[in-house]
Amino acid sequence: METPIKIVAGRSNPELAKKIAAYLGTPLCDAKAENFSDGEISVNYFESIRGSDMFIIQSTNPPADNLMELLIMIDAAKRSSAYRITAVLPYYGYARQDRKDKPRVAITAKLVANLLTQAGADRILTMDLHAPQIQGFFDIPFDHLYSSVVLIDHVKNMDIADNLVVASPDVGGVKLARKFASELGTELVIVDKRRPKANVAEVMNIIGDVKGKNVLLVDDMIDTAGTIVNAAKAIKEAGGLKIYAAATHPILSGPAIERINTSVFEKVIVTDSLVSEHDFCSKIETVTISNLFGEAIKRIYDGESVSYLFDSKNISQKITNHH
């Protein structure tokens, strides 16, 4: 008997879950998560999931409730005899706390890995981890997708590739920016910033030439937008022409929207890994990653290679030809 597939939506990003289910041609599993009056979370599956291959879709931002809800959904699935449970985290929260960067602090990324595994996840599927080595915090299969294949495709269709350079807003993002530069056939520029204290970014010097060029700043996330907006300002002052940004995760906390609205950016391209308030910002454009996740889930379910999806040529063919 064939193992049935079940796609479950947590409350963090129901729209993305719907799109993924539509890509797979399967309805969302009949399930409900709700809060009791004291704030405790209750999860209920209203259909049999015994023996099913389950994919629970939940980004963990804001972290506390969404992570707890995901753990409870996994626990309920395990106790209902699901055959295999894959936790699908388009955005993996707490990934920035991946090591002890000062004395007497937690390694929360590892704690989250332990919690997911202990709750009963058999496999993890996520995208653009802030620190890729977090994969090693797990002793279960871990599939790590890259949004760059989707974002690069989008940039190629924007008619800005002429006279373009790709920039990293800090030294840590060079690897990601290099991938964009390589795929787009452009030079790479680095903005070397020093951060005096948490959530305060200070731009220093630009390594590379931006004078008279269009510039695409690339990052894995935009949180308060300080880093990327300051980098754009520095590039503009150094003679950059039109400035764009591409980032995977639109956390957009605190003053982010206001900063982007008043920034020198022409456009800021993000994915729908998170639901955010960017409707209030005309500069932000969203590209869906639903087909990328849909294809990855299909491949995991069918026992096929997921690394096939790391190549943008495969992605373009696969997910744009899919109806």
From Swiss-Prot:
GO molecular function term, any single one: magnesium ion binding
Positions annotated to bind ATP: D38, G39, E40, R96, Q97
Record-listed E.C. numbers: 2.7.6.1
Record: residues binding Mg(2+) 1: H130
Cross-referenced Pfam families: Pribosyl_synth, Pribosyltran_N
Family under the similarity heading: Belongs to the ribose-phosphate pyrophosphokinase family. Class I subfamily.
Name this polypeptide is given: Ribose-phosphate pyrophosphokinase
Gene transcribed to yield this protein: prs
